[in-house]
UniProtKB/Swiss-Prot annotation:
This is Aldehyde dehydrogenase. The gene is aldA. The lineage of its organism: Bacteria, Thermotogati, Deinococcota, Deinococci, Deinococcales. Its EC number is 1.2.1.3. The keyword Metal-binding does not apply. It is an enzyme of class 1 (oxidoreductase). SUPFAM superfamilies: ALDH-like. NAD(+) binds at G228, F229, G230, L231, E232, A233, G234. It holds the Pfam family Aldedh.
Length: 515
């Protein structure tokens, strides 16, 4: 079924709050502070509309600095005891959270889809299973983590202990609200920290559904969630002298501000920022008409996953010129077969953009691409569906152009692919690295030696080789250049939420002899 052939009806999950639905949102969400639901100090709330139909379905607390202070109070009360809790107990709590989420997977998946707009087939098969696995992974990591001992001499020993930072701040994005929340919560909690977390104002609801679900599993104050807008709630959190670390995922310009706040307080920062990821296809992918070629075509179409709202979206396709026409013909056919429909229909392959602001931004870049002279190969317009006319939909779009165009250089964060050709390996590497960003990249070839050379040469924190958009818990993720600082995932993430205590102990009764 093509985008143009959609039928208005859908067979899938019932809309939240309707008969048969697996989830019902509250009419209004307060902040989650100290294990309690606490109204915002100033009594203000903001409307939250679903991208699916553009209609308001709940309200969230419009928090201010006063609410952030209440959350920090609760976190500081909880942090000492939580930090002293045995790694076994912390690990077991994370495992219980994972089990609870798994038992309620459909409820969380539908909540995430309604809040964000992404297809429920993605939340069911990717977002939630990955989030669950991240809790289990870090539950295992903290049990396996060991300190160190160095024998300086026969009577002097250096002991090294991992200690939590204390209270940390976390600000998560709107493209994967639950998964990005878990990416930050799991290692921070495993390491023994208390957390104050601020969700994106575009998606404030699904994380609150999660907190309702797991609140009884956590000691009061260990996790605190404060909703609100960036300047009103995010800035007071990021700039607070009462946090020992700030972790942020979002756009690069905001990341610069966050880093400035952290510098003022001399605290560590983890930033996962923007990207303009190249996806490179060498001519040997078409040597055979086989499963690998089919996989490579799918790899190019991955730009449409999550409606293109992924920091590592493979938004630049670089295709060796000798195969461009043949390869692109297959890719366009695959894109035009994408099913756009109701996000709660398991058959829907692409859903709604997360907000009306993001919709407008994407549509503006479609105009920019045309104005630059790029050729529209497919898509290029807003998606329309009967019954969801007010939803935030965009048809997956492929432009053909060159790497100096704005659509190749600026992060669009939508289902928009900019494709260009290259002659040889050297040009492919030059084009791939001709960007301010360096978060991710894709590489497709049957030549493993070339794959290694290119993978080492590409300036990006992750280079997917003959795959794309795979996010296992035990693979480090983070950016080069203006795509960020620090890493997410992998056991090394524990180090980002801990500090090393060295006890240098002399067992000798004898003085040193200097005085």
């Amino acid at each position: 079924m093509t985008v143009a052939e959609q039928q208005p009806q859908h067979q899938g999950y019932a809309n939240p709050g309707t008969p048969g639905s697996v989830v019902t949102f509250k009419k209004r969400y307060d902040n989650f502070i100290g294990g309690q639901w606490v109204p915002p100090v100033k009594g203000q709330y903001f409307d939250n509309a679903s991208p699916v139909d553009g209609k308001v379905f709940t309200q969230a607390a419009r928090s201010t600095a006063e609410d952030v202070e209440l959350a920090l109070d609760a976190a500081h009360r909880a942090a000492p005891a939580w930090g002293r809790t045995s790694v076994t107990e912390r690990s077991n709590i994370l495992l219980k959270i994972a089990d609870r989420m798994e038992q309620n997977l459909e409820m969380l998946a539908v909540a995430e889809t309604w809040d964000n707009g992404k297809p429920v087939r993605e939340t069911l098969a990717a977002d939630l299973p990955l989030a669950i696995d991240h809790f289990r992974y870090f539950a295992g990591c903290i049990r396996a983590q060991e300190g160190g001992l160095s024998q300086i001499d026969d009577s002097t020993v250096a002991y090294h202990f991992h200690e939590p930072l204390g209270v940390v701040g976390q600000i998560i994005p709107w493209n994967f609200p639950l998964l990005m929340g878990v990416w930050k919560l799991a290692p921070a909690l495993a390491a023994g920290n208390a957390v104050v977390l601020k969700p994106a104002e575009q998606t404030p609801a699904s994380i609150m559904v999660l907190m309702e679900l797991i609140a009884d599993l956590l000691p009061e104050g260990v996790v605190n969630v404060v909703n609100g807008f960036g300047l009103e709630a995010g800035k007071p959190l990021a700039s607070s002298p009462r946090i020992a670390k700030i972790a942020f995922t979002g756009e690069t310009n905001t990341g610069r501000l966050i880093m400035g706040y952290a510098a003022d307080n001399l605290i560590p920062v983890t930033l996962e920022l923007g990207g303009k990821s190249p996806n490179i296809f060498f001519d040997d992918v078409m040597m055979e008409d086989d499963a690998f070629l089919d996989k490579a075509v799918e790899g190019m179409v991955m730009f449409a996953l999550n409606q293109g709202e992924v920091c590592t979206c493979p938004s630049r396709a670089l295709i060796q010129e000798s195969i461009y026409d043949r390869f692109m013909e297959r890719a366009v056919q695959r894109v035009e077969a994408i099913t756009m429909g109701h996000p709660l229909d398991p058959g829907t392959m692409i859903g709604a953009q997360a907000s009306t602001e993001q919709l407008d931004k994407i549509l503006s870049y479609l105009d920019i691409g045309r104005a630059e002279g790029a050729e529209v190969l497919t898509g290029g317009e807003r998606g329309q569906r009967e019954g969801l006319e007010e939803g935030f939909y965009v048809k997956p779009t492929i432009f053909k152009g060159h790497n100096k165009m704005r659509i190749f250089q600026e992060e669009i964060f939508g289902p928009v692919l900019a494709a260009a050709t290259f002659k040889d390996e050297a040009e492919a590497l030059e084009l791939a690295n001709d960007t301010l960003y360096g978060l991710g990249a894709g590489l497709w070839t049957r030549d493993i030696s070339r794959a290694y050379r290119m993978g080492r040469g590409i300036q990006a924190g992750r280079v997917w080789t003959n795959c794309y958009h795979v996010y296992p818990a035990h693979a480090a993720f983070g950016g080069y250049k203006q795509s960020g600082i620090g890493r997410e995932n992998h056991r090394m993430m524990l180090d980002h939420y801990q500090q090393t205590k060295n006890l240098l102990v002399s067992y000798s009764p004898n003085k040193m002899g200097f005085f």
